[in-house]
Design a protein with these regions (language model features):
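Short hydrophobic beta-strand that contains or immediately precedes a catalytic carboxylate
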Residues: 32-34, 85, 105-106, 372-376
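Short acidic, Gly/Ser-rich segments with clustered Asp/Glu that frequently serve as metal-coordination loops
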Residues: 31-44, 377-384
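Conserved "right-hand" nucleotidyltransferase catalytic core of DNA-directed polymerases
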Residues: 1-14, 36-37, 164, 168-358, ...
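Short, contiguous acidic/charged loop-to-helix segments that flank catalytic cores in large enzymes
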Residues: 291, 316, 320-325, 338, ...
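Short amphipathic alpha-helices in soluble, non-transmembrane regions
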Residues: 611-619
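Conserved catalytic core of nucleic-acid polymerases
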Residues: 202, 330, 335, 416-418, ...
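A short acidic-Thr-Gly-centered motif at the start of a beta-strand
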Residues: 16-30, 74-77, 355-371, 583-584
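Active-site-proximal helix-loop-helix substrate-binding element of RNase H-like nuclease domains
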Residues: 2-13, 42-179, 187-191, 197, ...
């Protein structure tokens, strides 16, 4: 039964009701379908026009332009009633604009993504309704809500009510599938995390526009300078003379050295490829991965640096300011579930903001007397590998605060590492200063001095440490000899030897990764660590008939997904705990960003120091489900601007 709350003249297709009746009815239910219709997609510029809520028996369709929906808060914010939505972040932001927070939700879109992680599938409501319920939703009616300003038609009211029915039917099917795959905890995590991401998208992050414009101007100037360096390189090479301009226009206001005399558009991959082929570099494209192996060549190195600078100038130049909303804040949009369980952001991509603080510091709290309190995990993926492999060296190094990369380098390189130590090497030096000197018990329980094994500045050690560090972090991405060779600019044979020596020193890590790879090859899927056990499917898996190429892809993904995915599960758990703590205690704190394993909040400065320690405790507590030893710690800082 449809009950309409709005203009009483529209009664031919349904009963007329009130918000009070809707609240009374919905309060008595344990599960409800919820949907909204809006005039557009951007909550900052558009408005909510319809709220639909109900169960399989009664659906209330409320014209939010005509009535006050604030009484619905007690239903929508109740933690005792499950609210089913599709793409909850979208509806949540419009509801928050109306002063209502959501709690205890089930997102049918996220459920589909969880169940089909790794597979190519559409997660739209229309496709799910068609696939599971065998009902075709009307596209014609769906599009009529955009920009709609008049009274609702009967077809629009019926369409809105049907959405509620479909959501309830879909969720009933999804619950069974989630239970069969033992992903109930994961689904709860994703549903709760969606509200935290919704808060971030709603809150936005402030931007210091004048400082950003200064950076943009500097970046563009440097791009032009690098463009001229590329031109000058061509001008000195007779073999590339075909790319010289036959004539060029001078300008009395521009220095001759600043006038381009080379007929190459460096932003055109096609033209650049022609230049490289003429130069003698035989490649099929000019992508960074392709060119990296040739980086020792001065010309290629210069071009790669130019591309990096050009990206700063274009992606993070004046064009970026188009992302600033009317309130001076930047709002991104999160894609919550990638194949590994990690997130991505777009419009703009905040995860790709240059890590250096020149750019990060342009982002501000944007509220008087508010500051940033940010927290990130220290060596999160390394701690996950140590926990999964139970490697004694890794566990000891991380537990005792030693520099893991240096410890690994010592074991991999042996005598070469020892012979490369300088006289004042911080890895070996004895000292009575705190954090430099350390003690341990011998077999008789007596304190003995031991090397602090901290990162040092010895030139040779730096190189050896970098080599091993590349492997340590590369483990999380399934790095092989080819990639390692490209990264370190060494031969593939040298990379193979380095990896062999590495696994000889750390057999437990080799076994851990091998077993992950075998599991994926044998089952066609891989899981993250307990308790969430996120499942990633491999559609290309065909048992014994899987091609060698696909076997390689599956093996690599099986090694990195549990590491990256468990890290993602941990970060989402932290976000949920932070959000719950803020709301439960009504704190003057807002979550404004999350990038990789970092959570960024803004807080009134009078509460900043207190919140710093609270946030650090929450970040630590959120790791214990996955790393019960408490091995992983968080670094938390207070700052005036956003920092790495």
């Amino acid at each position: 039964m449809i009950k309409f709350v709005g203009n009483p003249r529209l009664v031919s297709c349904c009963e007329v009701s009130s918000v009070a009746e809707a609240v009374e009815y919905c309060e008595s239910k344990s599960i409800l379908g919820v949907d909204t219709e809006t005039t557009g997609l951007n909550f900052m510029e558009e408005t909510m026009t319809m709220l639909q809520i109900g169960d399989g028996d009664v659906q209330f369709v409320i014209d939010t332009r005509a009535v006050d929906i604030s009484p619905m808060r007690k239903v929508l914010e109740s933690k005792d009633i499950i609210k089913i939505l599709h793409n909850v972040k979208f509806d949540y932001k419009f509801l928050r604009k109306s002063g209502i927070r959501l709690e205890n939700v089930w997102d049918t879109m996220l459920a589909s993504q969880v169940l089909n992680c790794g597979k190519k599938a559409s997660h739209s409501l229309a496709n799910l309704v068609s696939g599971h319920l065998h009902i075709e939703m009307s596209k014609d009616v769906r599009t009529t809500f955009i920009g709609h300003t008049g009274e609702f038609t009967e077809s629009q009211i019926v369409y809105g009510a049907k959405d509620v029915e479909y959501l309830l039917q879909l969720q009933a099917i999804q619950v069974k599938l989630v239970e069969e795959l033992d992903m109930v905890m994961l689904m709860q995590l994703e549903n709760d995390a969606a509200l935290a991401y919704g808060d971030i998208e709603f809150n936005g992050i402030g931007l210091n526009i004048p400082v950003w414009k200064e950076l943009s101007a500097t970046a563009e100037k440097q791009r032009v300078e690098m463009e001229l360096k590329l031109d000058n390189f061509i001008a000195t090479k007779p073999s590339l003379s075909a790319f010289n301009m036959s004539s060029f226009q001078t300008d009395m206001f521009i220095e001759d050295t600043e006038i381009r005399k080379i007929d190459v558009k460096w932003t055109s991959p096609k033209q650049v490829l022609e230049v490289f082929n003429t130069y003698g570099i035989d490649v099929e494209d000019v992508n960074a991965n392709t060119l990296h192996v040739f980086r020792k060549d001065e010309f290629i190195d210069l071009y790669i640096k130019y591309k990096e600078q050009a990206k700063l100038s274009t992606s993070y130049g004046d064009k970026f300011l188009n992302n600033v909303d009317s309130d001076g804040r930047v709002r991104t949009s999160f894609k919550q579930i990638l194949n590994t369980g990690r997130i991505a952001s777009s419009g703009p991509n905040m995860q790709q903001i240059p890590a250096n603080n020149d750019y990060r510091n342009c982002f501000i709290a944007g509220e008087d007397d508010w500051v940033f309190v940010s927290s990130d995990y220290s060596s999160q993926e390394l701690a996950i590998i140590a926990t999964g492999s139970k490697d004694p060296v890794w566990l000891a190094a991380l537990t005792e605060g030693k520099d893991l990369h240096s410890v690994c380098a010592e074991l991999v390189y042996g005598e070469q590492w020892k012979d490369s130590a300088e006289e004042d090497c911080a890895y070996y030096v004895y000292s009575t200063e705190a954090n430099v000197m350390s003690y341990k018990k011998d077999s008789n329980g007596v304190d003995v001095r031991c090397y602090p094994k901290q990162k040092c500045n010895c030139p040779a050690h730096k190189k050896l440490r970098t080599n091993v560090k590349s492997i340590n972090f590369g483990l999380a991405y399934g790095m092989g000899p080819n990639k390692l060779a490209d990264t370190l600019l060494i031969t593939e044979r040298a990379a193979e030897k380095l990896i062999k020596d590495y696994f000889k020193a750390f057999p437990s890590i080799e076994n851990f990764l091998r077993n992950l790879g075998l599991y994926g090859l044998q089952t066609g899927h891989i899981k993250t660590f307990a308790p969430y056990r996120r499942m990633r499917w491999f559609p290309e898996w065909k048992g014994y008939n899987t091609s060698q190429k696909d076997k390689g892809k599956i093996e690599r993904a099986s090694k990195n997904t549990p590491i990256q995915g468990s890290g993602a599960d941990m970060c989402k758990s932290a976000l949920v705990m932070v959000r719950d703590h803020i709301h439960h205690n009504k704190l003057p704190v807002k979550i404004v960003m999350t990038v990789h394993d970092q959570i960024d909040t803004i807080v009134h400065k009078d509460y900043a120091d207190t919140w710093k320690y609270t946030l650090q405790d929450i970040m630590g507590a959120s790791t214990l489900d996955i790393i019960p030893s408490g091995l992983l710690k968080a670094d938390t800082n207070v700052s005036e601007t956003w920092e790495k």
